[in-house]
Amino acid sequence: MTTIKTSNLGFPRIGLNREWKKTLEAYWKGNTDKETFLKELDGLFLSAVKTQLDQHIDIVPVSDFTHYDHVLDTAVSFNWIPKRFRSITDPVDTYFAIARGVKDAVSSEMTKWFNTNYHYIVPEYDESIEFRLTRNKQLDDYRRIKEEFGAETKPVIVGPYTFVTLAKGYEESEAKAIQKRLVPLYVQLLKELEAEGVKWVQIDEPALVTASSEDVRAAKELYESITKELSGLNVLLQTYFDSVDAYEELVSYPVQGIGLDFVHDKGRNLDQLKKHGFPKDKVLAAGVIDGRNIWKIDVEERLDAALDILSHADVEELWIQPSSSLLHVPVAKHPDEHLEKDLLNGLSYAKEKLAELGVLKEGLLSGKAAVSEQIEESKAALKALKAFATGANSAQKEELNQLTEKDFSRPASFEERLALQNESLGLPLLPTTTIGSFPQSAEVRSARQKWRKKDWTDEQYQAFINAETKRWVDIQEEIGLDVLVHGEFERTDMVEYFGEKLAGFAFTKYAWVQSYGSRCVRPPVIFGDVEFIEPMTVKDTVYAQSLTEKHMKGMLTGPVTILNWSFPRVDISRKEIAFQIGLALRKEVKALEDAGIQIIQVDEPALREGLPLKTQDWDEYLTWAAEAFRLTTSSVQNETQIHTHMCYSNFEDIVDTINDLDADVITIEHSRSHGGFLEYLKEHPYVKGLGLGVYDIHSPRVPATEEIYQIIDDALEVCPTDRFWVNPDCGLKTRQQEETVAALKNMVDAAKQARKKQAQLV
């Protein structure tokens, strides 16, 4: 008889009411002392674990909770401190300096955690690092929960293969040697856990799902070196986000358990299991509930899936768990949530997913009859959800069916458009602009709250937005920017704003998830067909344009980003959803152009993150992603300049797709790549308009004019001068006014210096 247990891989850190965010930001602002700060975070850690214990999860993780990022935790624990931060003596100050930067040292690079909306701090390797274990966080966390609750838990750590794969600063040929140098540190950490009596440790190796067979074999040697030093500690090797190609090699690792994702594996893990079986002496930790979406499960369907897995895995112990950490979904349904009943009842967040695991466990142990009530309840909830969504359906399918190839392409080539736009727009060499948003002060947030609480009328709120817009148009004029933006003060979030004005979206009040650091977002819920209702941005953009003789950019979020930053429905394909959004936005683009706006930016910062993890699956996604963008933008005249913006990406992977977007100008977050993309451009020139971000907007640090000038000068070594733009990395919403104005002044001054140099070269 197989023993069935429930397990979890990770839990949201932020708290039901974003207490984690508020605690961090109060400390960063100096409003909380260190002792109070650490005590408050400890309380949040305990609360997260207690929630899981209260849901009767058999195997609860610890050390997934962090003060900023779990990858950064691993780096700091192994003394991977970049040189520029080693003079800082306090460990907490060092930790946050790496994440956020300080006056004289830029922060470490931040990038997407695989193909999710979470960002991690990229570990930096250099030969001067003294490899040593500075802190055993896993042991500290295990002891803390044992002390507080008397509970046995499962410490979690990023594994050596994934950690080095995610790091930078070394040649590819050095990777295996660096991994081997980490082995003694893992052994030390794990032996300390073993001495404490820890029963299980979860070592996360998601990078193995994209690893070659050779690398999977090489990583096996790491685990042979690690586990041969252990005698009483059980190791669970955990993969997620996709299937493992070298399945037979992986399940032969010298560990006591293997975690596999049976949700996002496209059926491949299950096929491998059926073909090759699974070692009887190992625990199979099966991801059977989606850790990344927010929809209630069909209990019978998921129970059948778990039974199918069990029928092909002759194991003594099966753990059922989410497909990945629940970091990617909200904490729990909030008692004050305002959604329609049938929609709310069809949702399942982290806490609810743990309860669903309990139902599946009971069904596996006692049969379907034991959970018949829950089966019927889930079917009724999903039926009501479908009826609710169907009520919002539109005639958009007919519009999509009538699209032709002409609807996906501009009338003229880029070179022809460029000549017309240069004549029409009259911009200087190296034009300066920003990416869209400006700081949202406490006054802006307060005004929005007053309006939402009905303390202010629509007219009062619009008057405030207009005043703030005018103030920042004046500031931009004074700074000397060439192409202005209205500042987006009416928007809380670049996706939420559009979803609120399109049919087919629902918005929560409390369903927050972590994006990076203390930054939290509320992804929209796409429950029905997406449809344009009325112009969304025209009024505010036209007002801003009336305040200046300079060009004002229209600012939209692109269809792929809206899709990738939402919780999408699962009853139709992602491609179909993207095309629905693209068709709706196409009407907004046309409305802006008809209103006299000559530069329209359609942001796609999340285009790359939607890539499937396996390159064999890329072409299909990239093809329809580019098509959705062109569907949005191709209705405009040749004289209208289309911009797009991307951030946090390994752009080398998608340069062909960037070109296929056929945008006239693309602005790219660049400063945190520390010159990496420039190196790529030396070998692979980009011929359309390009703006490489010249300073990091995620840090309060104000870069000097000379520093920005040098970045521009370096870029012009490889980028065409007549189509290069100067801009910050991303929007400036989260920054303070003083630092924003100072940085932009320096940026404009640097651009002027660069123009002078270019004039001298002519």
Curated annotation (Swiss-Prot):
Binding site residues for Zn(2+): 645, 647, 669, 730
Cofactor(s) required for function per UniProt: Zn(2+)
Binding site for L-methionine: 435-437, 488, 603
Keyword field: Amino-acid biosynthesis, Metal-binding, Methionine biosynthesis, Methyltransferase, Repeat, Transferase, Zinc
Superkingdom of origin: Bacteria
GO-annotated molecular function: 5-methyltetrahydropteroyltriglutamate-homocysteine S-methyltransferase activity; zinc ion binding
Active site location: 698
EC number: 2.1.1.14
A biological process term (GO) from this entry: methylation
SUPFAM superfamilies: UROD/MetE-like
Pathway listed: Amino-acid biosynthesis; L-methionine biosynthesis via de novo pathway; L-methionine from L-homocysteine (MetE route): step 1/1
Cofactor note: Binds 1 zinc ion per subunit.
Protein residues bound to 5-methyltetrahydropteroyltri-L-glutamate: 18-21, 112, 519-520, 565, 609
Entry keyword annotation includes Acetylation: no
Enzyme class (EC, first level): transferase
Binding-site residues for L-homocysteine, renumbered to this chain: 435-437, 488, 603
Catalytic activity: 5-methyltetrahydropteroyltri-L-glutamate + L-homocysteine = tetrahydropteroyltri-L-glutamate + L-methionine
Record-linked Pfam families: Meth_synt_1, Meth_synt_2
Protein's job: Catalyzes the transfer of a methyl group from 5-methyltetrahydrofolate to homocysteine resulting in methionine formation.
Family listed: Belongs to the vitamin-B12 independent methionine synthase family.
Name of the protein this chain belongs to: 5-methyltetrahydropteroyltriglutamate--homocysteine methyltransferase
Taxonomic classification: Bacteria, Bacillati, Bacillota, Bacilli, Bacillales
